From Swiss-Prot:
Pfam families: UbiA. It comes from Bacillus cereus (strain ATCC 14579 / DSM 31 / CCUG 7414 / JCM 2152 / NBRC 15305 / NCIMB 9373 / NCTC 2599 / NRRL B-3711). PROSITE patterns: UBIA (PS00943). This is Protoheme IX farnesyltransferase. Interacts with CtaA. One of its GO terms (biological process) is heme O biosynthetic process. Keywords: Cell membrane, Heme biosynthesis, Membrane, Transferase, Transmembrane, Transmembrane helix. Belongs to the UbiA prenyltransferase family. Protoheme IX farnesyltransferase subfamily. It is found in: Cell membrane. One of its GO terms (cellular component) is plasma membrane. PANTHER family: PROTOHEME IX FARNESYLTRANSFERASE, MITOCHONDRIAL.
Length: 307
């Protein structure tokens, strides 16, 4: 895409953007929705580490504060940097063309500087818990910014798998803030659940937005290999979630039943996609189910510790 075409896209995006407040623009810059959803997984890791180490949350309120604020700043920072990196392709996609780095509400230099500052500030807050929490935060940030955004996103269909590594780190940040050894198997089950969950989640989104990804030149799996192969991959990864609750027996039978029912429901919906003619409608259903799945699953992990 030449410079003139890019300018036309930018101008079109700007003129079609609704009026927004400075706060709304800031929330879009740091991708507040992503930060909020990942905060749940950070808190779950923190809470379960307390539970399995026989510790009280009231005795660790300071660590809870530093963990939530620190991880939130790290995630917000890497999202800012992602907006900075993707500012050339975001105008080409419907769901990203109103980002403040596209519309001009925030200049690229500000997004870069602000992202780096709050990222470093996040590491400082995490350092007030344990060095291992900082290391986990760094691994997540490096994977998302360098390995995903700068390297694989625009080159390989495996970009989804690489990006899922960074998205699986937040519960380990929370756990490491309490137990830096990360020696309990449930800590790594949280990582595996988050890693595997993201792949069918984002592949479903890629099917829904396949034309946008194609227009932006991003080699998502459905763009390169089509819907049938993508649906098979979604099913393979969804089935991989099925045995994981049985390695989390420490959370009790109630959680194992809830998690297994959620997994079976997702698998059944997935198989339905091979009979359904409207692939886009099915991908939306899979995407919505995945969001509800994650929320119910992680809230259940917390709730069962009270009984």
């Amino acid at each position: 895409m030449n410079h003139a075409t890019s300018e036309l896209h930018d101008e079109s995006a700007v003129t079609s953007v609704p009026e927004t407040t400075r706060l709304q623009d800031l929330k879009a810059l740091v991708k507040m929705g992503i930060v909020n959803s990942n905060t749940l997984t950070v808190f779950t890791g923190f809470w379960l580490a307390l539970h399995f180490n026989g510790l009280s949350v009231m005795d660790n309120l300071d660590k809870l504060f530093f963990t939530i604020v620190g991880s939130g700043l790290v995630m917000a920072g890497v999202c800012c940097l992602n907006n900075y990196i993707d500012r050339d392709i975001d105008p080409l996609m419907e769901r990203t063309k109103t980002r403040p780095t596209v519309t001009g509400k925030y200049k690229p230099g500000f997004a870069l500087t602000f992202g780096l500052v709050i990222l470093l500030l996040g590491f400082v807050f995490l350092l007030l818990t344990t060095p291992m929490a900082v290391l986990m935060g760094f691994i997540g940030a490096f994977t998302y910014v360098v390995l995903y955004s700068l390297w694989t996103k625009r080159k390989y269909t495996l970009n989804t798998v690489v990006g899922s590594i960074s998205g699986a780190v937040p519960p380990l940040i929370g756990w490491a803030a309490i137990d830096p050894s990360l020696g309990h198997p449930i800590a790594w089950m949280l990582f595996l659940i988050m890693f595997i969950w993201q792949i069918p989640h984002f592949l479903a989104l890629a099917m829904k937005r396949v034309d946008e990804y194609r227009n932006a030149g991003i080699p998502m799996l459905p763009v390169v290999h089509g819907f049938e192969i993508t649906k098979r991959q979604i099913m393979i990864w969804t089935v991989c979630l099925l045995p994981l609750p049985f390695y989390m027996s420490g959370l009790g039978i109630t959680f194992m039943v809830i998690a297994t029912l959620l997994n079976i429901g997702w698998i059944v919906l997935g198989f339905y996609g091979f009979r359904k003619k409207d692939d886009i409608k099915w991908s939306v259903q899979m995407f919505v189910y995945s969001l509800n799945y994650l929320t119910i699953l992680f809230v259940s992990m917390i709730v069962v510790t009270f009984f």
